[in-house]
Amino acid sequence: MRLPVVDSRQKGARTETLARDMLRKHTGLNWERVPGSGALDPKHQLKGDLYVPGQTNRFCVEVKGYADDHINSGLLTHKTPQLIEWWQQTQRQATQVDKLPLLIFKHDRSKLFVATVVFDDDALLEKRWLMYNADDYEFYIFLLEDWLNISTLKFVS
């Protein structure tokens, strides 16, 4: 019996759509996928995977969906864990367009998570969360839904 082949572009598009829909639901903004998934030149101010058209976006939103869970002991033992590679990409793209980095990610059959350098309400600390600090990287990880339900951060200015 032959197993179905997973198209990584389709899987990425599905994860981006899932994140987009959750952002729309919780923010009331008309989030869209970036044409070409962030491949545009920085002069277009469209890096990352999701944005709000016609608005000044405050975040560069990168979305990743993979089969395996990347919040594991590898964060402390691997030279460059996958999550850190994603964060490096998110941070690099955010810097190119002068925005705050925001990484949304999930693994197969999981909820969506968010990695961010900002949160605005100490009530978030009553939820489950992680802080990652290694080398030059420090960021927080929350369930995306918790972060969106509690945060009052503005996504556009």
Which residue stretches match the model-derived regions?
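Catalytic phosphate/metal-binding cores of nucleic-acid and nucleotide-processing enzymes, i.e., regions
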Residues: M1-S157
